[in-house]
């Protein structure tokens, strides 16, 4: 019987090698974890070399409701946010800070030729996490807005005071506020039933049933179902004063100062509220507490003629394409803009008539001109008389899109199948020959009132043969 002998030295050597490999593996895991949790990148401010030659050059402001990994009806996806901000960077935009805006209006200092002020308005943790990774990549800086009440709430999805201090230290964030709380008054549902006052949680639970006829907490008197104030002037004054005082108390307790930037909810009232007396109280507090106020929404450009307490921003919707945002900014600024084309090989098959088109996989994202239309023409040497078309028309219910068949160059002749405001219309040489309300296919046939944000994708099949046309919507024969 043979004997096998083991060398203690060899065994120890194997243990040492195994320990070294395990140590290296743990170090790699540790480094990866640290990189995921902490950022070592610092924001690099723009150089004075790119300042505009004129003091008149203003800035655009973009304000996102919030960021979600996949996106939803309100929050933009990380993919879309990165695409939009990257397109702006490629067009020469750099981010500016609150101090730059203050110096622009109070000291007449110049800004970069293409200046972008970036805001995020929901104060959510996931917004800060997802947005910062993108801003680090692009060397962009933003302002995170919060409601003071959320800093001391038990809801973990909102940033607290410690979070805000950490964000400010990262160099990629500045702080701003929407006030003390998000709350609603004078609310009606879509059936015109009076709901009264709702907090943000109550509002969000039934938001799909609420009519656009409502107000934010600091905008008006609290009123009954007939529009009659339920409070005296003194009660209204005390109510609004309380919100500003609580906001100050919480911020000074949690982050040791009141943010210098305010965005009054809601925008576009003309002043600082929908009632003159309410507006005067808000105006007093705004001027006393803040260096600047974003008071309007819908336009991106602020210039020398704007008031620092009446600034405007554009709020990109979560469903906007990159070209839609670029088109809105181009319309506001009239500055040169490079739009996104996407798949250039597929784009080569089409002639652009108006607007801008992005080709992504099997999709064409067509963006219309401001107050105009977007149109593409398929390049072909053939004159198709009989055709079959199958496509999905994606987008919002409110609006118009369609397909021209057998059309001449200016589309004055031919067949036009139009989807407009939940109706299907068919035109022959610009004469409407058929119209059908698609609500007839729905469970709620009587619904005619749609919100501008309501979305509906439609599967459209069209067969045109000689003088006969067949149109099928969502597998239902229309004509």
Give the predicted meaning of each segment.
Residues 1-18:
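N-terminal Lys/Arg-rich, disordered targeting/topogenic segments
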Residues 146, 202-207, 254-319:
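His/Asp/Glu-enriched short active-site or ligand-binding loop at hydrolase and phosphoryl-transfer sites
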Residues 368-434:
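Secretory/extracellular carbohydrate-interaction modules
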Residues 432-459:
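Short, aromatic/His-centered strand-loop micro-motif at the edge of beta-sheets
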């Amino acid at each position: 019987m043979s004997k096998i002998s083991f060398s203690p030295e060899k065994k120890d050597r194997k243990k040492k090698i195994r320990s070294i490999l395990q140590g290296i593996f743990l170090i790699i895991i540790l480094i990866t974890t640290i990189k995921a949790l902490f950022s070592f990148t610092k924001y690099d401010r723009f150089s004075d070399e790119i300042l505009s030659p004129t003091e008149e050059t203003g800035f655009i402001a973009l304000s996102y409701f919030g960021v979600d990994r996949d996106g939803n009806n309100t929050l933009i996806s990380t993919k879309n946010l990165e695409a939009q901000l990257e397109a702006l960077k490629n067009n020469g935009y750099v981010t500016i800070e609150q101090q730059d805006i203050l110096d622009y209006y109070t000291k007449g200092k110049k800004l970069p030729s293409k200046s972008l002020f970036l805001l995020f308005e929901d104060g959510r943790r996931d917004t800060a996490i997802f947005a910062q990774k993108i801003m680090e990549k692009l060397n962009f800086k933003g302002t995170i807005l919060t409601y003071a009440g959320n800093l001391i709430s038990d809801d973990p999805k909102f940033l607290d005071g410690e979070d805000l201090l950490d964000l400010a230290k990262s160099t990629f964030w500045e702080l701003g506020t929407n006030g003390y709380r998000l709350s609603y008054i004078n609310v009606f549902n879509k059936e015109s039933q009076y709901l009264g006052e709702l907090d943000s949680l109550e509002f969000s639970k039934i938001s799909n049933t609420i009519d656009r006829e409502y107000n934010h907490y600091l905008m008006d008197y609290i009123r009954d179902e007939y529009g009659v104030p339920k409070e005296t002037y003194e009660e209204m004054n005390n109510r609004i004063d309380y919100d500003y005082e609580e906001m100050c108390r919480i911020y000074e307790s949690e982050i040791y100062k009141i943010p210098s930037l305010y965005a009054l909810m809601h925008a576009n009232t003309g002043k600082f509220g929908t009632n003159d007396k309410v507006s005067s109280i808000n105006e007093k507090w705004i001027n006393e507490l803040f260096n600047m106020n974003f008071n309007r929404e819908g336009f991106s450009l602020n210039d020398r003629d704007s008031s620092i307490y009446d600034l405007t921003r554009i709020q990109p919707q979560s469903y906007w394409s990159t070209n839609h945002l670029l088109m809105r900014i181009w319309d506001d600024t009239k500055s040169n803009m490079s739009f996104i084309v996407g798949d250039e090989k597929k784009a080569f098959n089409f002639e652009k008539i108006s607007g801008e088109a992005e080709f992504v996989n099997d999709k064409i994202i067509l963006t219309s001109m401001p107050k105009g239309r977007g149109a593409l023409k398929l390049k072909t040497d053939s004159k198709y008389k009989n055709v079959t078309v199958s496509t999905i028309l994606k987008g919002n219910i409110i609006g118009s899109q369609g397909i021209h068949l057998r059309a001449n160059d200016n589309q004055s002749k031919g067949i036009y199948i139009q989807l407009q405001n939940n109706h299907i219309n068919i035109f022959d040489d610009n004469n409407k020959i058929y119209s059908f309300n698609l609500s007839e296919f729905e469970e709620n046939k009587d619904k005619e009132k749609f919100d501008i944000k309501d979305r509906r994708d439609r599967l459209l099949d069209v067969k045109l043969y000689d003088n006969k046309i067949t149109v099928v919507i969502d597998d239902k024969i229309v004509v």
